[in-house]
Structure formats: structure tokens, C-alpha cells
């Protein structure tokens, strides 16, 4: 297919994987990233955690743990939170088709795909190696560009000898007032 639209989360720069990993690390007595998928799939129900960043959702999780919520229902809530955030902050008012193709390493966890299906009612397609699809797409686009324009060439030394030119600090500028520091 051909990309016809693109959008990023305008409130938070954390990706799904880093969001889940950070929360599992913060609540390591309760969650384990390696088992988070199976924990969520074993749940009888999920709870609503909202669409907060990991800083604010931690408070919600602490209150839920204190009130006796099971780790299984909280795991479902984590996955659902990711998708609610996506639907409200990235998809926004855009229409989606009947099938959703999901890529990125977090989609190697079936529970995340289940959350997408549950919240959208769409058929979900997950490739065998969801974490490599973005790199594959980028390489195919680069190949097409090089094939179509013979004046371009790929200097392999530039590929293997990459230096990071800059690293800067930033403040989160989410609408809910996160103002937490980060590094990019």
C-alpha cells in the first residue's frame, strides 16, 4: 500500500514499548514485562486507567493496587490505556478502515492487539515480526529511491560510521501539564 496520512502523538513522545517498560519497571513487584502479555490474557476483566502519561498513570495504578485490583485486570488496563491514548491523541477524528495493520515490537504481545480489536471493532493484522516492519519499509523506500535515480549512490561508509551529533534536553509540553524533563 501507499501511505496517505501520518500523525504523531502531540502530547507525549514516549512510545508504546517504553511506556509499558517504564511502568513494569516502576511496579516490578507487581508486573514483569516478559509476562505482561500472559498476565493480561489471563484476566477476567480489565479496569480503566485512562490515557495519562506514565508519570500520572502511576498514581492511578497505585490507587488501583491499594483498592485490591488484580494484576491481571491492571495489565489489561495498561494495554487499553495505550490504545485509548492512540485513538484520542493520534487518530483523533480520522476515519479508519475495517482492517488495522499493527507494527512495532509491542505488537508481539497479543494482548495489545486484542485491545485494539476490542476498542475499534476492526480486524487486526499483525505481521510475524512486527518489530522489524518499520525498518523493512524504510529500506524498501531507500532501495526504490536509489533504483529510480541512478545519480544517487549509497556510501556504505556513512551507514556504518554514524556519530550522534547532538543530544538535548527537553520538557514535556503535554496539555495536562506534565512538564517532566527528558532526553532526545
Segments and roles (model prediction):
Residues 7-15, 77-79, 101-107, 125-135:
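Active-site nucleophile and cofactor-binding loops and adjacent substrate-binding regions
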Amino acid at each position: 500500500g501507499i501511505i496517505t496520512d501520518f500523525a504523531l502523538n502531540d502530547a507525549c513522545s514516549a512510545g508504546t514499548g517504553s511506556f509499558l517498560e517504564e511502568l513494569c519497571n516502576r511496579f516490578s513487584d507487581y508486573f514483569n514485562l516478559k509476562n505482561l502479555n500472559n498476565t493480561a490474557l489471563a484476566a477476567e476483566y480489565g479496569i480503566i486507567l485512562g490515557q495519562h502519561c506514565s508519570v500520572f498513570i502511576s498514581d492511578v495504578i497505585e490507587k488501583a493496587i491499594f483498592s485490591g485490583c488484580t494484576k491481571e485486570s491492571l495489565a489489561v488496563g495498561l494495554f487499553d490505556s495505550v490504545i485509548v491514548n492512540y485513538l484520542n491523541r493520534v487518530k483523533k477524528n480520522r476515519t479508519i478502515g475495517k482492517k488495522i495493520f499493527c507494527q512495532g515490537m509491542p505488537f508481539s504481545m497479543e494482548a495489545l492487539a486484542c485491545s485494539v480489536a476490542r476498542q475499534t471493532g476492526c480486524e487486526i493484522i499483525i505481521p510475524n515480526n512486527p518489530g522489524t516492519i518499520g525498518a523493512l519499509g524504510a529500506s524498501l523506500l531507500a532501495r526504490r529511491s536509489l533504483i529510480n535515480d541512478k545519480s544517487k549512490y549509497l556510501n556504505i561508509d556513512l551507514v556504518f560510521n554514524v556519530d550522534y551529533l547532538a543530544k538535548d534536553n527537553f520538557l514535556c509540553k503535554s496539555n495536562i501539564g506534565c512538564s517532566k524533563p527528558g532526553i532526545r
